Amino acid sequence: MRGVLIAAMVALVVSLLGTPWVIRLFRRQGYGQEIREDGPSSHLTKRGTPTMGGTVIIVAALAGYFLAHLVTGIGFTASGLLVLMVMTGLGLVGFLDDYIKIRKQRSLGLTARMKFTGQAAVAIVFGLLAVRFKNDAGLLPGSTYISIVRDTSLSVGIIAFPLLAWIIIAATSNAVNLTDGLDGLAAGTSAMVFGAYVIISFWQFGNLCEPHAAEAGCYLVRDPLDVALVAAAAMGACFGFLWWNASPAKIFMGDTGSLALGGAFASIAIVSRTELLLVVLGGLFVIETLSVMIQVAFFKATKKRVFNMAPIHHHFELAEWPETTVIIRFWIVSGLAVAFGLGLFYAEFLSHGGG
């Protein structure tokens, strides 16, 4: 528990104190955000706000994780390092996307094919490595079985597992990317979901199956304490960044941050065996993504729009909701989704005779 607290506090302090330094640096370098011309007119005033703030989130999370290990003397684990690999790798893809936008002074960076390739490369490497590194109990970081709150009996097989990992990682990172359209929305929502994973992973650690004396409801997962430590570091980094990203934002996380956070969620879900539970915990990300899919499909079929604009947070902006009202109400929705997801997690534990 001490390591989890240290990771969260270090990441919070690094992010909180490091972000203003990055804001000044990026302003001097001219790393300002370009704004979509077809977006809400109120967003035009945000043009030039420093972006690529996700670099601070990643660095703060890494600092929290590694310093916590240094202080506690706990060894590194395959699961924790794999999650950080995905977070950093997708952060790099997002950084390239943001950098191209800045250099070419446009709102579009990497081509869809280039971003797809980058996400696929990171995800497939994760998928290949996650089914290696068996520990003394015979557990792997990943599992070929589809998981809800723990593994089900449905397996995709060792060959298809990297493909499954890619689907989960790409879908989640793109969902967070779509949500990152209002000041503080993605950062605040991400902090809540990471907080949920701190609770889930620490609970799994306290209820691990013993090799020869498995208790009712126990969990067969590898390295849950280290996963909790990663989630705590990411949560602290998001909260520290949110201080400066809250409306009116002094800096945006950019694709650097949104892709990294989405990758972290997906990889944590895989190593904690909660792949489908992530759909509930990240309910706001799902709503935002579905709004885009519905808008595109309906427009192609009828040439009419369901929403004023997608993702759905822009719909409410164009309906003349103040931006802060949209953000706070969406945070409430996210909080309810997280609470419901944690309730499902605990109910499943009780249904297996735990408690």
UniProtKB/Swiss-Prot annotation:
It is a multi-pass membrane protein. It is an enzyme of class 2 (transferase). It comes from the Bacteria. Keywords: Cell cycle, Cell division, Cell membrane, Cell shape, Cell wall biogenesis/degradation, Magnesium, Membrane, Metal-binding, Peptidoglycan synthesis, Transferase, Transmembrane, Transmembrane helix. Pathway: Cell wall biogenesis; peptidoglycan biosynthesis. It is found in: Cell membrane. One of its GO terms (molecular function) is phospho-N-acetylmuramoyl-pentapeptide-transferase activity. Its EC number is 2.7.8.13. One of its GO terms (biological process) is regulation of cell shape. The keyword Membrane applies. The chain crosses the membrane at residues 3-23, 56-76, 80-100, 120-140, 156-176, 185-205, 224-244, 251-271, 276-296, 330-350. Its cofactor is Mg(2+). NCBIfam families: mraY. HAMAP family: MraY (MF_00038). This is Phospho-N-acetylmuramoyl-pentapeptide-transferase. The gene is mraY.
